[in-house]
Design a protein with these regions (language model features):
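Catalytic alpha/beta core domains of metabolic enzymes, predominantly
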Residues: 1-18, 22-26, 102, 109-229
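Active-site beta->alpha loop and helix N-cap motifs at the rims of alpha/beta catalytic domains
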Residues: 6, 11-12, 20-149
């Protein structure tokens, strides 16, 4: 209750609702599949391993692992995401761009690219980039007091402009292992409405704390299972 209550009195999110959206009968947003993300594919899980961790639970193996600036020496049997300026075209590895590096997107060849994108980024630039690059999957991020509202606004902006790029939702937290239940409740509160509205092609949960990777990955899969349309 306190977590949701903190959104009260937040700054206005100046978004527009796509005219074809129906809150009473939501359908999954139409997207063009990029490899196994979007389209008719089930939503994916991206896991964070910037701390160098390599071992995942056999029960909750992520589809993709974001490793930041360097690939681990020992890799798991899944795909990897690495910062675009460190990308060397390694097998089963794909580049991720921050929104302020849009000019670099065309310079790198890859069948799948990720773009970290907040609502409020210069829309003319990123909309043109997404239209030109259907291989991009958007990773929606937000630091807004009501980040659920801001992430929903970003996806509606994509729909209003006829874009079919898939969207993965990035959520960040700061919890210790002892606060596992708080993490689970907050992640479910942030992700549930976006999942039920059919706006999400994947989940990326990040925690700056002592929570185990297995607990974070299990939470992501639990949210997907509970909210499946």
């Amino acid at each position: 209750v306190d977590y949701i209550g903190h959104r009260a009195g937040h700054m206005l999110v100046p978004g527009l609702e796509w005219e074809g959206f129906d809150y009473l009968r939501p359908e999954r947003r139409k997207t063009r599949a990029v490899m196994n993300i979007g389209g008719e594919n089930l939503p994916v899980v991206i896991a964070d391993r910037m701390d160098g961790g390599v071992k995942s639970s056999s029960e909750f193996t992520p589809d993709y692992i974001y490793c930041g600036r360097a690939l681990p020496e020992k890799r798991e049997e899944c795909a990897y995401i690495i910062d675009a300026d460190m990308y060397q075209g390694e097998e089963n590895t794909y580049p991720a761009f921050p929104y302020n590096q849009l000019p670099l997107v065309s310079a790198i060849q890859a069948p799948l690219k990720f773009l970290f994108l907040p609502f409020g980024a210069p829309s003319d630039e990123y909309l043109a980039c997404l239209k030109q690059h259907p291989e991009i999957v958007v990773i929606s991020q937000s630091n807004h007091q009501n980040r659920l509202g801001e992430q929903r606004a970003l996806i509606h902006e994509l729909m209003c402009n006829g874009l079919l790029n898939p969207v993965v939702i990035f959520q960040h937290y700061q919890h210790s292992q002892e606060e596992k239940s708080d993490f689970q409740l907050e992640a479910a509160a942030d992700m549930g409405p976006l999942m039920f509205d059919g706006l999400c092609d994947g989940v990326y949960l990040f925690n700056n704390g002592s929570l185990s990777h297995d607990d974070i990955d299990a939470t992501a899969y639990g949210i997907l299972q509970a909210a499946r349309l």
